[in-house]
Amino acid sequence: MKLDTSHMRYLTTDDFRVLQAVEQGSRSHEVVPTPLIHQISGMRSQSGTNRAISDLAKLSLISKMRNVKYDGYRLTYNGIDYLALKTMLNRDTVYSVGNTIGVGKESDIYKVSDKNGNPRVMKIHRLGRTSFHSVRNNRDYLKKSNQGANWMHLSRLAANKEYQFMSMLYSKGFKVPEPFDNSRHIVVMELIEGYPMRRLRKHKNIPKLYSDLMCFIVDLANSGLIHCDFNEFNIMIKDKLEDENDCGFVVIDFPQCISIQHQDADYYFQRDVDCIRRFFKKKLKYEPKPDSSMLDTEGFGDGYKYAYPDFKRDVKRTDNLDELVQASGFSKKHPGDRGLETAVESMRNAVYNSDDDMSNDEAEEENGEGDYSEEDEYYDSELDNESSEDDSEDAQEEENERIIEALSSGVENLKMDKLGNYILE
């Protein structure tokens, strides 16, 4: 779905009042009745409301539902885009929208700027659009949740959750983008001048980078959180270092974080570790071994006692960030978060297979190097189409390209299921 802001400047105050009324009515109605829209908007005349509704429908900001017993409308993704952008424009967070940086698993990424021309990144969450794993999996977890198909609401929750995670982590000194604003399903954050680690083939100090990444996983866990998607696609390598103490990377994509008290915390922690081990072994030919003769346990890899972190051995809680942001697994959630947790749970497991785990060196030798099936958070058109070493990886990449091509060319010709999910033939 492309972001089209060309009509935004022509919308009147009344148009936005009616659009916001549809949004508010959507909290209790799948299809918002026209009389309710008029009532919520506070418009003086019904004719003024009807005019605004007509204009908004022509711009596909709202849509009229067929085969319903009453005259009503529902908000579209274009409509909620406009509402979020309008809010950020009023806050002077976003002034202009630039080109698409890429298409992620459940989001679109744009380059934007503020009123002073400072470049930023705008991430638009679009849960339920099209799963990069399979459309069927998304439908499965929808049926299990029994929460309905209010993907806009889930996208809003995911964006708010990511903004909370980033704000808390940034304030604690973790290497994450600086968050600037959040409105509805959109998060605006710092633009990182760099590239995804998946493109990394040479580095001046590979052992240090490896150790720093492993320490990030442990430090995050010591603060109460596990990333759950810590891989080469969600790690940005910076073009320039700020100082000699700069580790040279920034971690992105946080909606799926869980608490270290989660019942599967050990599994997700080890999976994050294994993703880094596989990448360094496969692409950088770096595979450190444990060295019992070394006494230093402040890092991992060459020159240290341990080759990689272990959840039970290395994680020692020093902070309660999971409690502060109410991360999954810490406590019982408000009913409104259950649908989000179900959706994000599917995202966590969409492209991973438990057979790929490397709990020890023997398992690694038995299972081989493992597959690279995670998707890139930023699909850069300049990335080289590398030859895959595994047939399943080739198939996954081909599916991703097909989805991205369909999304980039528009969704007008795509069919939709009853829940509003786009289906690729």
Swiss-Prot record:
GO terms for biological process: maturation of SSU-rRNA; maturation of SSU-rRNA from tricistronic rRNA transcript (SSU-rRNA, 5.8S rRNA, LSU-rRNA); positive regulation of RNA import into nucleus. ATP binds at K123. Keywords: ATP-binding, Cytoplasm, Kinase, Magnesium, Metal-binding, Nucleotide-binding, Nucleus, Phosphoprotein, Ribosome biogenesis, Serine/threonine-protein kinase, Transferase. The keyword Cell division does not apply. Residues 350-420 are annotated as: Disordered. Pfam families: RIO1 (PF01163), Rio2_N (PF09202). The active site is at D229 (proton acceptor). Its EC number is 2.7.11.1. This is Serine/threonine-protein kinase RIO2. It is found in: Cytoplasm; Nucleus. Changing D417G: In RIO2-1; nuclear export of ribosomal 40S subunits impaired. Belongs to the protein kinase superfamily. RIO-type Ser/Thr kinase family. GO terms for molecular function: ATP binding; metal ion binding; protein kinase activity; protein serine kinase activity; protein serine/threonine kinase activity. The keyword Phosphoprotein applies. Component of a late pre-40S ribosomal particle, composed of the 40S ribosomal proteins and the non-ribosomal factors DIM1, DIM2, ENP1, HRR25, LTV1, NOB1, RIO2 and TSR1. Its cofactor is Mg(2+). It comes from Saccharomyces cerevisiae (strain ATCC 204508 / S288c). Required for the final endonucleolytic cleavage of 20S pre-rRNA at site D in the cytoplasm, converting it into the mature 18S rRNA. Involved in normal export of the pre-40S particles from the nucleus to the cytoplasm. No longer associates with pre-40S subunits in RPS19 disruptions, suggesting it acts after the ribosomal protein in 18S rRNA maturation. It catalyses: L-seryl-[protein] + ATP = O-phospho-L-seryl-[protein] + ADP + H(+); L-threonyl-[protein] + ATP = O-phospho-L-threonyl-[protein] + ADP + H(+). Residues 354-400 have a biased composition (Acidic residues). Changing I186V: In RIO2-1; nuclear export of ribosomal 40S subunits impaired.
